[in-house]
């Protein structure tokens, strides 16, 4: 038995399921999760000392690579001055100014401690600002584990949402409407059936929680137009895409200006940080300047702010955005080409520094229903083959994978060599 397997057994005695976030348990791929001992650059090292080229990157934050020296030193320096004050600091101002400069639609913003907290607060603000209760999300898009957002679609676009987790009251879930991603008609139908009742649309501009699904042409423009016509706010959940799809986020990549934006992951440089912000007139509605309450003891934590500021300062250096996108495209194109050579049907999507692939005969993947038609069992097999070959991909067919600036040509080519061998095994097994 490996040390990771031993630790997993031990963890299950005191931690529900042995993990502190469900996807880490490998339920989506089977087997026991690897327990990580340390990480550096493009690599993670498990409890048995085995190295893996990492394409999870802590689910997105590690855009500069693991254990970056500048971020590490920023954390140490900040920690030496104190871990938490519960009072405002100058670094919070510097951080807010930098984020607003990089993401201009965020005229004002507030720091929180997680992406879930950011989306939860943005939803409350949208409801308070508009005086409306209902929100619209998309099937397959994940926005954290707040009650309003743990809802899936019913049978048909006009069906009221049903809770997808015990503990979410149906009476509460009914205020969440679910449309089909990349389908503007489903959005229009919901607005028509709930005239004057919808406070906001919240959307992952690139859906990263049903793997990696970009918007079809005109989709985000259509959402912007519908919100303007209906008096609803458009919220871009850029927890995953922020600073990764482009330096200014997916909204810069697609040239769309949302009313509110939520951020997480990259903004903390590996520390627990989230943020929400947007138009000044909307943000002024949050306490203490407005009636919508939001607070947090650790919001704007000085150590987390130092890490985030160091990360974004490095990330904005000239050439980094293009370099990240270029190496990710090279990797994605390589996966697609190798799969084709071995006769493996594969759809590969890539935007900026995130990518995903689907084992399917379908020509393209545009929504959650398309994802459910993919060969999940073949993904599981491929995942474990890649693990055996020293490559760590997202352990779920419904999660995107990520590159970092620390992934060099050596790591990319080693990954493609591993993929070549794994596709060959899949092809042989299917004969």
From Swiss-Prot:
Its EC number is 5.4.3.8. It catalyses: (S)-4-amino-5-oxopentanoate = 5-aminolevulinate. Its cofactor is pyridoxal 5'-phosphate. The modification N6-(pyridoxal phosphate)lysine is found at residue 265. GO terms for molecular function: glutamate-1-semialdehyde 2,1-aminomutase activity; pyridoxal phosphate binding; transaminase activity. One of its GO terms (biological process) is protoporphyrinogen IX biosynthetic process. Its main location: cytoplasm. It is found in: Cytoplasm. It comes from the Bacteria. Belongs to the class-III pyridoxal-phosphate-dependent aminotransferase family. HemL subfamily. Homodimer. This is Glutamate-1-semialdehyde 2,1-aminomutase. The lineage of its organism: Bacteria, Pseudomonadati, Pseudomonadota, Gammaproteobacteria, Vibrionales. The gene is hemL.
């Amino acid at each position: 038995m490996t040390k990771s397997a031993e630790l997993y057994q031990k963890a299950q005695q005191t931690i529900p399921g042995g993990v502190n976030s469900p996807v880490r348990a490998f339920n989506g791929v089977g087997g026991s999760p690897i327990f990580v001992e340390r990480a550096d650059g493009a690599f993670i090292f498990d409890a048995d000392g085995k190295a893996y080229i990492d394409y999870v990157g802590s689910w997105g934050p590690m855009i500069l690579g693991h254990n970056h020296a500048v971020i590490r030193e920023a954390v140490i320096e900040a920690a030496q001055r104190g871990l938490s004050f519960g009072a405002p600091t100058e670094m919070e101002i510097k951080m807010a100014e930098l984020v607003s400069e990089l993401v201009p639609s965020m005229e004002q913003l507030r720091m929180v401690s997680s992406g879930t907290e950011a989306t939860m607060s943005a939803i409350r603000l949208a409801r308070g600002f508009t005086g409306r209760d209902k929100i619209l999300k998309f099937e397959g898009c994940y926005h954290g584990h707040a009650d309003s957002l743990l809802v899936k679609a019913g049978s048909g676009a006009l069906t009221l949402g049903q809770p997808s987790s015990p503990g979410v009251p149906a009476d509460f879930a009914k205020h969440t409407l679910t449309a089909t991603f990349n389908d503007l008609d489903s959005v229009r139908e919901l607005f028509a059936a709930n005239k004057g009742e919808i406070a906001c649309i919240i959307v992952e501009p690139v859906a990263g929680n049903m793997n990696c699904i970009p918007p079809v042409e005109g989709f985000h423009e259509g959402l912007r137009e519908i919100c303007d016509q209906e008096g609803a706010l458009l919220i871009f959940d850029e927890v995953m895409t922020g600073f990764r799809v482009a330096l200014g986020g997916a909204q810069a990549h697609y040239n769309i200006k949302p009313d509110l934006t939520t951020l997480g992951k990259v903004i903390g440089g590996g520390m627990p940080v989230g943020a929400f912000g947007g138009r000044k007139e909307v943000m002024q509605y949050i306490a203490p300047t407005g009636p919508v309450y939001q607070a947090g003891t650790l919001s704007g934590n000085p150590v987390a702010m130092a890490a985030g500021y160091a990360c974004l300062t490095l990330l904005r250096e000239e050439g980094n955005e293009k370099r990240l996108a270029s190496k990710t495209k090279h990797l994605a194109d390589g996966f697609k080409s190798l799969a084709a050579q071995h006769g493996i049907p594969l759809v590969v999507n890539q935007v900026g520094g995130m990518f995903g692939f689907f084992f399917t005969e379908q020509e393209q993947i545009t929504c959650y229903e398309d994802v459910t038609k993919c060969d999940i069992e073949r993904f599981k097999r491929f995942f474990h083959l890649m693990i055996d070959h020293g490559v760590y991909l997202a352990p779920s067919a419904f999660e995107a994978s990520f590159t970092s600036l620390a992934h060099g040509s050596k790591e990319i080519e080693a990954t493609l060599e591993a993929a070549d061998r794994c596709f060959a095994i899949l092809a042989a097994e299917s004969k």
